[in-house]
Design a protein with these regions (language model features):
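Short coil/linker segments at helix-helix boundaries
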Residues: 1-10, 34-120, 139-157, 200-207, ...
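Flexible helix-coil transition and linker loops at the boundaries of alpha-helical arrays
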Residues: 10-24, 62-78, 94-127, 164-183, ...
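Amphipathic alpha-helical repeat scaffolds of TPR domains
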Residues: 1, 19-39, 69, 74-85, ...
Length: 394
C-alpha cells in the first residue's frame, strides 16, 4: 500500500503541473483503482473509502478519454493536411537554387532542439476504455458485498456510464482486430459483476442473470480460439453466479449444479491449452478444487441436490487432487499454503463421508505449517465463500 500511495503522490504532482496531460490522468486513475482494490480487501478500512477513490478514477478516465479523442482527431486532420501539402509540393517542385541550399543548411544547424511527443492512437483510446471497464468492475464488486454504502442511484449511474463505453467499441476497434478479444473480455467481466450486483439488489432475476452472463462470454471473439485467460474468467463468473444464488437461499440447485459443472469444463479446457503459463495452470487447478467443493456443498441442506449426494465422495476426492496439484504448481508460499490446507480439508471431508464422523477441525489446523491462527482464518474464509457449511463450529 505504501508503494501505491507514493506512486499516487507522484502522479498527482504531475497532474498539478499539467492538468490536461492524458498520461498523467490515465496513470493517476490506475493507481486510484489499485488502492481501492487493496482497501476493499482490508476489513479494517471502510468500503466507502474505496468507493470515493473509484469515483475519482472514473472522472479522471473520462477526462483522459475526451482529451485523447480530441488529440486523435487533430492528429488525423494534421496528417490529412500534410498529405495534401506534400501532393501540392510534388506538382510544383523545382530544383533549389544555391542560395536556398545554403539557407536550408543553416536552418538545419540552428534547429537542433526538439521535443518528442508520443502521438495518440486508437490503441491509446482502447487502453483507456478497457481501464474504465476494469474500474467499473471493481466498483460493482464492492457493491455486491456492501450495497448499503452507495445510494440506490449508483447502479443506474453505472449502467448509463457503461452504455457510453459500449457505444464507443465499434468506432475505436474497427481497424484493431487484435484488440477485440481484450475489449470483449473486460466488458464481459464487467457485465458479469454488474448482473451479480443487480441480482443481489433484487433488480435482476436468476434467469436474466444467467442468460445475459452467458451472452457476454459466448461472443465469437471470446468463445472461438479462447485463451486460458478468457476461460478462467468465464469459470470465475460461473462460480460467482452459483455463490450469488446460494446467498439468496435460492432453491435452483439444478441451475447451480449445471453452472458449476460448466465452470469445471471451462477450467479443464483452459488447462489443456498448449503453452499455458504455469501461474494460470495453477489457477485452473485451485479453481477446480473450489468448484468441486461447491458441487459437494449442494449435497447438504437446504439444497440437498440428488446428483451432489450421489457423487459426494468423488467430488471431495477430485477437490483433494486439484488442490494438491495447485499447491505443487503455485509460485508463492502463500498460494501453496492455501491450496495445501484446502487439500487437507477435502481429505477430512472424504473421511466424514465414508465414516460418518464429524469434521476434525483440530486435525486440519494442526496440519498447517503456517500456524493455528492462520489456519483458522483460512477455514473462516472457506465458510464465508460457501466452501464449508456455515454450521461448522470453528
Amino acid at each position: 500500500m505504501d508503494a501505491l500511495k507514493a506512486a499516487l503522490d507522484a502522479h498527482q504532482y504531475a497532474l498539478k503541473l499539467d492538468p490536461d496531460n492524458a498520461d498523467a490522468l490515465f496513470n493517476t486513475a490506475q493507481v486510484l483503482t489499485s488502492i481501492a482494490e487493496e482497501i476493499a480487501n482490508d476489513d479494517d478500512i471502510p468500503d466507502k473509502e474505496a468507493l470515493k477513490l473509484l469515483q475519482e478514477a472514473l472522472e479522471l478516465q473520462s477526462k483522459c478519454y475526451s482529451i485523447q479523442e480530441l488529440k486523435l482527431e487533430e492528429s488525423i486532420e494534421q496528417e490529412r493536411q500534410a498529405n495534401e501539402q506534400a501532393a501540392n509540393l510534388e506538382e510544383t517542385e523545382t530544383a533549389p537554387t544555391e542560395e536556398q541550399q545554403r539557407d536550408q543548411e543553416s536552418d538545419a544547424e540552428e534547429d537542433q532542439w526538439f521535443t518528442v511527443v508520443e502521438p495518440v492512437t486508437r490503441d491509446s483510446l482502447i487502453d483507456t476504455l478497457v481501464a474504465q471497464f476494469n474500474t467499473l468492475t471493481t466498483l460493482c464488486s464492492i457493491l455486491t458485498d456492501a450495497p448499503e454504502i452507495a445510494p440506490p442511484s449508483t447502479l443506474p449511474m453505472i449502467e448509463e456510464y457503461s452504455s457510453r463505453l459500449v457505444q464507443r467499441i465499434p468506432v475505436i476497434s474497427h481497424d484493431k482486430p487484435e484488440r477485440v478479444q481484450e475489449i470483449s473480455l473486460s466488458k464481459a467481466n464487467f457485465v458479469s459483476v454488474l448482473l451479480e450486483a443487480g441480482f443481489k439488489s433484487g433488480k435482476v432475476d436468476a434467469v436474466t442473470y444467467k442468460r445475459e452472463r452467458d451472452a457476454a462470454f459466448t461472443l465469437p471473439e471470446l468463445s472461438t480460439n479462447g485463451t486460458a485467460e478468457t476461460q478462467i474468467a468465464n469459470a470465475r463468473s460461473l462460480v460467482s453466479f452459483n455463490s450469488a444464488l446460494a446467498d439468496a437461499y435460492s432453491n435452483d440447485s439444478a441451475v447451480r449444479w449445471n453452472a458449476l459443472t460448466e465452470a469445471v469444463q471451462q477450467l479443464t479446457a483452459a488447462s489443456k491449452i498448449q503453452g499455458i503459463d504455469q501461474a494460470e495452470l495453477a489457477t485452473t487447478h485451485l479453481l477446480r478444487g473450489d468448484a468441486n467443493l461447491f458441487l459437494y456443498a449442494l449435497a447438504l441442506p437446504p439444497a440437498s441436490h440428488q446428483a451432489a449426494i450421489t457423487n459426494a465422495a468423488q467430488l471431495t476426492k477430485n477437490a483433494d487432487v486439484f488442490y494438491r496439484n495447485a499447491s505443487k504448481l503455485s509460485g508463492t508460499r502463500e498460494e501453496k499454503a492455501i491450496a495445501s490446507l484446502r487439500s487437507v480439508v477435502a481429505q477430512h471431508l472424504q473421511q466424514q463421508i465414508s465414516q460418518g464422523t464429524a469434521l476434525d477441525i483440530g486435525a486440519i489446523v494442526s496440519a498447517s505449517t503456517n500456524g493455528p491462527q492462520w489456519a483458522l482464518e483460512q477455514l473462516e474464509d472457506m465458510m464465508a465463500e460457501g466452501l464449508l457449511p456455515q454450521s461448522l463450529a470453528i
